[in-house]
Regions:
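Short loop-beta-helix segment that forms the pyridoxal 5′-phosphate
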Residues: 50, 62-84, 98
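Conserved core segment of the aminotransferase class I/II
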Residues: 53, 201-238
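Conserved PLP-anchoring active-site segment centered on the Schiff-base-forming lysine
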Residues: 88-110, 122, 132
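Active-site phosphate-binding strand-loop segment of PLP-dependent enzymes
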Residues: 117, 121-190
Length: 238
């Protein structure tokens, strides 16, 4: 995982402020002025503990995504929420993910001794495509009725491949748990979004992770949220 300017500066013997950081996919335009204004307007609240239920935030996110706040759980960045998701994935016989993959996925899966395997995306003339070996293994899993999990990010990091929503539908039909990391979805025009948030209510085996880090350029705020069945989120919160 990139973005550790203090560490890089110590190696280069310079100030972190002079380093141009290309190691993390953060929006180069910086945080929205409205976000900075909101932070400044609430500085006085730093002396008080926040609401542990984050009800105002959950309500605002619920209005934005048109979903009940009980289906939303804010976290200490998407990384914390991915950790809890990987704990649930570790309960499956095996979890698959497309590779190359964001390094934090392997970290979180290993933390719970999850059995997992990668399926390589293959470079083709018009972009990166799902390998035939994955399709064959998927058919074997269907035949053996194994308890299988799947973890993917959409758009995919680092290839930039955007998967159609129909791929997730196919996964939901035969995977015990599907976790979709949509950290980069907001970089797309709304007309090109392939988010599956609107399917969560009909699919208890679906978890969607969102982040304010990448598009809104707020990595220091450490804010992400999960959208999933309330029973799962209550278990995570405990």
């Amino acid at each position: 995982h990139g973005g550790n300017l203090v560490w890089a500066a110590s190696l280069a013997n310079c100030s972190p402020s002079v380093i141009l950081d290309f190691s993390a996919s953060i929006n180069p335009l910086g945080p929205p002025a409205s976000a900075i204004a909101a932070i400044q307007a609430h500085l006085a609240e730093l002396s008080a503990y926040p609401d542990p239920q984050y009800q105002r935030l959950r309500t605002a996110l619920g209005l934005f995504h048109r979903i009940d706040p009980d289906w939303i759980l804010p976290g200490n960045g998407a990384a914390e929420l991915l950790t809890w998701a990987c704990r649930d994935l570790a309960a499956q016989e095996i979890t698959y993910l497309f590779t190359p993959a964001f390094s934090d996925y392997a970290r979180a899966l290993k933390a719970f001794n999850a059995r997992f395997a990668g399926w390589a995306l293959e470079p083709q003339k018009h972009g990166w495509e799902i390998s035939q070996s994955y399709r064959q293994q998927r058919d074997k899993n269907l035949d053996s009725a194994r308890s299988v999990g799947f973890l993917l990010n959409n758009p995919h990091n680092p290839t930039g491949r955007l998967f159609d929503r129909s791929l997730v539908v196919a996964l939901l039909d035969d995977q015990a748990l599907v976790v979709v990391d949509e950290a980069f979805m907001d970089f797309l025009p709304p007309s090109e979004h392939q988010s599956v948030i609107d399917w969560v209510k009909d699919a208890p085996n679906l978890v969607v992770i969102r982040s304010l880090t990448k598009f809104y350029s707020l990595p220091g705020l450490r804010l992400g949220y999960a959208i999933a069945h309330p029973d799962r989120l209550k278990r995570w919160q405990q």
